[in-house]
Every structure is written in C-alpha cells, then in structure tokens.
Amino acid sequence: MESWVFERGSLTRRLKAACGADFNVRVIRQGFAHPFPDEALLLKLRSGRRALVREVELRSRERRLVLARSVLPAQTLKGAGRRLAHLGNRPLGEILFASRRPRRHGFEAALAEDRHWRPAVRAGSGSAGPVWGRRSLYSIAGRPLLVAEFFLPAVLSVPESA
C-alpha cells in the first residue's frame, strides 16, 4: 500500500498503466459547494466561499480502487483552468499532469476512518475499517486546487510494478 500512497508522479498514469483499458472514472458528485473547514483553510478561502467539489471513483472495470475528492476554487477555474470544470468522466490527473508537472505545495498521508466519509461514498467501499488516504495541495498557473485520495482494499490487487 505504501507505494500507492506515496506515489510522487501521476496516480492516474500509474493506474492506467496497470489496468489498461479496464481503467475508468465514475463521477459520484460534482458541483459548487462549501468545502470542509480544513479544506477552505488550506486553500485560503474566505468563510462562506464556495468551490467546485468533485468526488469520483477510480476503477478497474467495476472494481473501486480509489475514491478521490477535488476542491477547486472559482479563481482556479478561470482562463486555462476553465477546462477543469468540464472533465466529465476524464480523470483530473490526466489534465493536471498533462503538459508539465503541477507544483505540489503540500502533502499529507494518514489512516482515515470510513465513518467520516459521506454515506453514499462509504457504501460498497469494501472497507471494514480505516483506509489510507493522502491529500495534496497543487497550483496550476499560480492558482490552488486540493486533491484527496483514499485507497480502497481492492487497490492491493493492482500490480505494484506499474
């Protein structure tokens, strides 16, 4: 699990290499919402500000491997960042790591209790307890975005060498 959690490059690229054509993204929810207080603090958003919140599953066929939550402030969605609001079933990492490495400003990893997840996300996670999660603060063209990823037990069945 450690090599997945502490992957420095694109998690999307690594999963695609390991899963091939079976890799897919399912959007759980996407829309403007109030970020969690700790997310707003990391993004330096004023109280009450909304941001684009996107929650997805990264999957191999129907098998859920990773749950991801991205928070993109309105300022990040301007100019070249506008395309980030219209990803559909494309993975954010595909855009984030496309041209050059995005700038990572912070990285946290911890065990996350599934009782803290939204019920819709928790359902069918395959987890009977805590799972490893990580959170990274990136900037694109000087504008921030926050990405959190939670590694479900099924990710252990994906080849580590990918």
Curated annotation (Swiss-Prot):
Its main location: cytoplasm. SUPFAM superfamilies: Chorismate lyase-like. It comes from the Bacteria. GO terms for molecular function: chorismate lyase activity. One of its GO terms (biological process) is pyruvate biosynthetic process. Keywords: Cytoplasm, Lyase, Pyruvate, Ubiquinone biosynthesis. Substrate binds at R54, L92, E149. It is an enzyme of class 4 (lyase). Its EC number is 4.1.3.40. Pathway: Cofactor biosynthesis; ubiquinone biosynthesis. It catalyses: chorismate = 4-hydroxybenzoate + pyruvate. One of its GO terms (cellular component) is cytosol. Transmembrane segments: none annotated. It is found in: Cytoplasm. InterPro entries: Chorismate--pyruvate_lyase, Chorismate_lyase_/UTRA_dom_sf. Gene3D superfamilies: Chorismate lyase-like (3.40.1410.10). Removes the pyruvyl group from chorismate, with concomitant aromatization of the ring, to provide 4-hydroxybenzoate (4HB) for the ubiquinone pathway. Belongs to the UbiC family. This is Probable chorismate pyruvate-lyase. It comes from Methylococcus capsulatus (strain ATCC 33009 / NCIMB 11132 / Bath). The gene is ubiC.
